[in-house]
Amino acid sequence: MTTHVILVARAFGAKGVYIEGKDEKMVKSILKVIDSWGGSSYFLVKEIENGKSIVNEWKEKGGTIIHLTMYGININDFQDRFEKIKYPLLIIVGAEKVEGWYYHNADYNIAIGNQPHSEVAALAIFLDRIYKGRELYMEFEDAKIKILPQKAGKKVIRSG
């Protein structure tokens, strides 16, 4: 699931991810995607030991912490605040049970609905709302593989 969250983060415009813990195989897989599909200077992947320290650093620097959770306020009720959010954003998505500390230290707990759902879907919808669909046209200059959109069929352009 973590790999899918990272792929969505990259494809939907996030500038990078922090991964709590070590997973060499997963990081290697993501770096391979970045090498082929681009984004090496745009999208950073960093393994960390303690997510709480990143949250505290982010707050000290004046950024905003968004925690995506089914227990938060509905994203539709948050819509008018998107223009007023202080950047940079740190978006927290958690697998399984997230510690209560994150709920209390996030600036906003936002739900993509109050039913059980995937972190992948929540992140995709949230980023799409922030970027208003512009992220769907994003291209990376250093991509070795690019898709040329087709009405029918598939066209892939390879370089390097």
UniProtKB/Swiss-Prot annotation:
Record has Cytoplasm as a keyword: yes
Catalytic activity: cytidine(56) in tRNA + S-adenosyl-L-methionine = 2'-O-methylcytidine(56) in tRNA + S-adenosyl-L-homocysteine + H(+)
Pfam families reported for this sequence: Trm56
Organism superkingdom: Archaea
Keywords, ordered alphabetically: Cytoplasm, Methyltransferase, S-adenosyl-L-methionine, Transferase, tRNA processing
Subcellular location: Cytoplasm
EC number, as in UniProt: 2.1.1.206
GO MF assignments: tRNA (cytidine(56)-2'-O)-methyltransferase activity
GO BP field: tRNA nucleoside ribose methylation
Entry GO CC: cytoplasm
Residues bound to S-adenosyl-L-methionine: L68, G94, A95, E96, K97, V98, I112, G113, N114, Q115, P116, H117, S118, E119
Keyword S-adenosyl-L-methionine included in the entry's annotation: yes
Catalytic EC class: transferase
Similarity comment: family membership: Belongs to the aTrm56 family.
Subunit structure: Homodimer.
Function: Specifically catalyzes the AdoMet-dependent 2'-O-ribose methylation of cytidine at position 56 in tRNAs.
Protein name: tRNA (cytidine(56)-2'-O)-methyltransferase
Record organism: Saccharolobus solfataricus (strain ATCC 35092 / DSM 1617 / JCM 11322 / P2) (Sulfolobus solfataricus)
Organism lineage: Archaea, Thermoproteota, Thermoprotei, Sulfolobales, Sulfolobaceae
